[in-house]
C-alpha cells in the first residue's frame, strides 16, 4: 500500500504530527520529574503503543528499561469481546519495580482493567498508566490513567500505531478512518 493509498483511508486528521510530538515531550518531562531518583520499567502494550513508547522513552531524562505485553479483547472484530487474553507476557520480573504501562488508547477500560489487576498481583513497587489517547465517553469501567496525552471523541482512529485491519499504523499522525471504510456498526 502506497503512502497515497494510506492517506486515502483517512477521513480527517485528528491530531497532527507536531502536536503529537509536543505533547509527548511534555509527558516525558512530567514523567522525568515524577520518577526522579527511581528507575522506571516501561511496559508497552503491543502492537499499538510501539510508536508512542519509542518517542516517550526518548523524551525521558531518567533511567528506564522496557518490556512488552500483548493482550487482546478484540479478536478479529473492531468491538471488544470482553474476553481478555495475554498473547505475550513480560520477560522481566516486576516485583518491587516502578512500572509504567504505556498504552496507545483507553477505550472501554475492560482490557486495561484486566491488565492492571494482573500486573498488581505481581507486586510492583508502583504501577501507573500513561495513555496517548483516551475516549472517556466509551468507558465501561473506571480505570485510573495518571498520564494522558489527549482526550478524544468516540471516533475510529488510526495512525501513529493505531490500526484498522493491521493497516495505517505507520501514519505519523492520528486520523479518523474514512467513513467509506468504516465497518458496519462502528
Q: What positions do the PLM features span?
A:
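PRPP-associated nucleotide enzymes
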Residues: 1-186
